[in-house]
Amino acid sequence: ILKFALSEKNIVTATKYLKVLPVIKKLIVYLNIPAPSEERGAALWHKDDFGYKSLDLFLAVSDININSGPLYYLKAKKELGVFLKIKNIIKNALPGERNKVTLESFSNYFDKDKIGALIGKSGTGVFIDSFTTYHRGGYCKSENRIMLRISYQTPDTKRGQQPYNQQEFAYYPKIKKKDIKNIFHRYILFKDRNKFLQFIKIDKIILSFIKIFHYKL
């Protein structure tokens, strides 16, 4: 998985989109199982509020159909990007539902033909910007879903800034910084903000700026 995440094609794709050499802030394989309840949490419409720009690869490990919790995403490109927000979010939200939008509310803003779905055989994938694109997924009706997610981001984002051993790769501690000889791979896996940017809490400054200029539908 790590070799695939560091593949030249993926890194070049992320670099072209982000305009800088990316860092990997999320590398995870999801296993979702059928749920008796209605959609909640990440199965509701949302954006990931961690920064200004991201490029996330979602890749089907198992075959995915309508019954196994496909990823849904807004295909329509919005010029306002991260600044666009739907104001009709869930009130008195339960844990995991903060800033989420119900399926019913979302349908009042965007037609079905504006929504894409990651459905297909194992190996089918899609790149989306999870910071600027509304998306949801993981609600399995009757079948399991296994999906790989890789988030390529810039070092100034909030995601991945929690304390951890910086000499080990957070998602697979057997990967040691000292063992990575390729300087680009070392940057991608272990790069953190410099101490000055950490001191001024640049991620909070960026997020506050974005919230000030939100355009709410």
What do the PLM-derived regions correspond to, one by one?
Residues I1-V23, A117-K121, K195-L217:
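N-terminal auxiliary "cap/dimerization" subdomain that precedes the catalytic jelly-roll/cupin core
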Residues S37, I66-N67, G81-V82, H135-G137, ...:
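Short catalytic/ligand-binding loop motif for oxyanion handling, primarily in non-cytosolic enzymes
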Residues N67-T133:
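Double-stranded beta-helix
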